[in-house]
């Protein structure tokens, strides 16, 4: 089994955070999120796919991951390229921006994998934040948009035994300043929270249509 | 054991949804969410606390719940009043706006309750969307604000055996049009989704700092 983590290039990274974090800080945020994810994946083989050499170097030397230099456009193609370059059939695909994922989740997935062909956990907004496939070519990958529903549709169409893994912590992907709030609530002892705290970021509760957090920077 | 559901008055209800749903529709949304929650609680005794007679009538006659007419201001006081009016020690407290909760979650909580004094599941934004207490006066209730952290603090202070129950579906509370999006993704076979569909509401994916969904009404 291999865990595949596709990573967007640093310069296109998290532009929705750009009012809040400089480009250098967004890069460091990404690297810290990858450190947290790697910790959850302890003992498993990790493959990082990216077109960005700085990320690939980090993945290789610090995360001790296999690396795949992305050749084609689009997330689905990047993952398929990684599929082609590994021998393993069994894969888990996770994004680079879910730093609240824990070892416990992966242990659950490995247990469930004995009984299911496909295991999926959603992001907020109908995306896919974890996808386990007993065999990498079982379905057509359909990331982007409401991929959670599309992947379930694939599973149904092919009569796969599938399981929906319900996790709030996996659902939290970091795209907006608002999202950083969840790191402050749930991210104790993560690299990501420690990094953000070091930048002087603080979070307060709010309840309005504009969101659930006030995220500020000292 | 009793499950306590505090419910705000209908006229103060979900004002953040008011651009999108009329007052009558927001009321019906609430009643449908309560129907979904009641389904998840099948077989358990439910107590609805509210100052609103229409809600209390619905709770009594349709949900077959015990009812408590709220006398004091504030969510914590409403729950404490319910504590006073029941004989049971063991309680689960859940809000009225988490229609994606499932029977499976409650079964998990009941199993875990053998080993823990306090079980908590967070909302998005650091609130508390499920709280199990082995004995109702074990902690000081501290709803409002980042109550998830405050309740954990209470548990630590008193050396309770506590468990953080990680569920995306429980984390989804319905406060904004954006939140309705999650119902469309995850709410198949719920009263709530069926009701919203009947109103001509539709949801599309979006990825911007303004949110993850485009929620429209035909």
Curated annotation (Swiss-Prot), chains A, B:
Pfam families: CofC
Molecular functions per Gene Ontology: GTP binding; phospholactate guanylyltransferase activity
Catalyzed chemical reaction(s): (2S)-2-phospholactate + GTP + H(+) = (2S)-lactyl-2-diphospho-5'-guanosine + diphosphate
Subunit and interaction comment: Homodimer.
Name under which the protein is recorded: 2-phospho-L-lactate guanylyltransferase
Enzyme class of the recorded protein, top EC level: transferase
EC numbers: 2.7.7.68
Keywords of the record: GTP-binding, Nucleotide-binding, Nucleotidyltransferase, Transferase
Similarity remark: Belongs to the CofC family.
Record's keyword annotation contains GTP-binding: yes
Organism: Methanocaldococcus fervens (strain DSM 4213 / JCM 15782 / AG86) (Methanococcus fervens)
Swiss-Prot/TrEMBL GO biological process terms: F420-0 metabolic process
Pathway assignment: Cofactor biosynthesis; coenzyme F420 biosynthesis
Function field: Guanylyltransferase that catalyzes the activation of (2S)-2-phospholactate (2-PL) as (2S)-lactyl-2-diphospho-5'-guanosine, via the condensation of 2-PL with GTP. It is involved in the biosynthesis of coenzyme F420, a hydride carrier cofactor.
